[in-house]
Regions:
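Glycine-/small-residue-enriched transmembrane alpha-helix faces in small-molecule transporters
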Residues: 1-36, 73, 81, 143-173, ...
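Hydrophobic alpha-helical transmembrane segments of multi-pass integral membrane proteins
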Residues: 6-10, 36-51, 121-134, 151-159, ...
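Hydrophobic/small/kink-forming positions within alpha-helical transmembrane segments
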Residues: 16-19, 23, 50, 72, ...
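Specific transmembrane alpha-helical segments of multi-pass solute transporters/efflux pumps
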Residues: 17, 21-22, 50-98, 134, ...
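Membrane-interface helix termini and inter-helical loops of multi-pass transporters
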Residues: 23-31, 84-87, 136-150, 199-217, ...
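Helix-helix packing/entry segments at the starts of transmembrane helices
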Residues: 38-40, 94-101, 170-193, 221-261
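C-terminal transmembrane-helix exit sites in multi-pass transporters
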Residues: 48-58, 101-126, 253-273
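Hydrophobic transmembrane alpha-helices of multi-pass small-molecule transport proteins
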Residues: 49, 69, 117-139, 161, ...
Length: 310
């Protein structure tokens, strides 16, 4: 088996794991509060990454520390919004809304860094925001733009997409100037510390040590964070960026399929159309928009905690 084929297969498996864990976490949240869950998973992930990349840590510079701190803050915010929102929304909607982070990156780059947006990216953004409206805003025959009745979990997940978009931007910049092993460990450690500090302030922590809680913690910490970092760092050396974007866009699809099979979730015609528009917008922006412009100072956003990524 060639390295390229092996890399493609590994990236598909990572994306599948990310998609499946939306349902795994949703199930576990019946027995554990969301912020406590985040803390446990991220502490375990940080310990695993620190052990795996131990030989790279003694040479961390102050500049790398600052970069890891910034990326870790947005990683923390993204996870907190995502997991808290998942308590109140469905796995499929959470996955598609989290995927908006990819679309928000060029928007924020245009606003904050004066980056030009080409027509393909603009079309992708427009399609994704149209899908966002259909997916989150309940139908109201009296008022076309009525925002009443929006699920609070959907709003929290939108906050997650915003945070992950900034995490992608700052991670990409950090990856051009610092060793990815050091940044990977630092962002996980920073997120873990902030999560632990937030728990007593923002919720009344509670856990029933059931099998589904333990399974969710192990899967998300070891496979979807620690192992995923390592796999991405290796696999994307042998995978064209357009192939990577296409593979990662399957995450919400895997989440929806898992939720449909395991939980019987059905999006309905309106929400399904919204999800399709979001997915189409992401693909248009990533496959056509990225191909139409050269690489920028933002750099490769890898290894990262994905769209998503739960």
């Amino acid at each position: 088996m060639s390295r390229s084929l092996k890399a493609h297969i590994l990236l598909v498996l990572v994306t599948l794991a990310w998609g499946v864990t939306f349902v795994v976490i949703k199930d576990a949240l019946q027995d554990i509060t969301p912020l406590l869950f985040n803390t446990l998973r991220m502490v375990l992930a940080a310990l695993c990454l620190a052990a795996f990349y131990a030989r790279h840590l003694p040479r961390i510079s102050r500049a790398t520390l600052r970069a890891g701190l910034l990326v870790g803050i947005f990683l923390w915010l993204g996870y907190e919004f995502q997991t808290t929102g998942l308590v109140l929304t469905t796995p499929s909607k959470s996955a598609f809304l989290t995927g908006l982070s990819v679309i928000l990156v060029p928007v924020f780059l245009a606003i904050g860094w004066r980056r030009m947006v080409n027509r393909w990216t603009a079309a992708g953004v427009a399609a994704a925001f149209a899908g966002l409206y259909l997916l989150t805003v309940p139908a109201d025959g009296r008022r076309l733009l009525s925002l009443e009745g929006i699920n609070r979990g959907d709003l929290l997940t939108l906050g997650c997409a915003v945070a992950f978009a900034f995490q992608i931007i700052f991670l990409g910049r950090a990856m051009r100037a610092h060793h990815y092993q050091q940044v990977a460990v630092l962002q996980a450690v920073v997120a873990a510390v902030l999560m632990a500090a937030t728990v007593p302030l923002a919720e009344h922590p509670h856990v029933v040590w059931s099998g589904r809680v333990l399974w969710a913690i192990v899967v998300t910490a070891l496979f979807c964070t620690a192992a995923a970092f390592t796999i991405q760092a290796w696999a994307q050396q042998f995978t064209p960026p357009t192939h990577t974007a296409l593979i990662f866009s399957l995450e919400p699809v895997f989440a929806w399929l898992t939720s449909y099979v395991v939980m019987g979730e059905r999006l309905g015609m309106r929400a399904g159309l919204g999800a399709a528009l979001i997915l189409g917008g992401v693909l248009l922006s990533e496959l056509k928009g990225s191909a139409a412009q050269p690489a920028t100072e933002v750099g490769p956003a890898l290894p990262e905690v994905s769209s998503d990524e739960v």
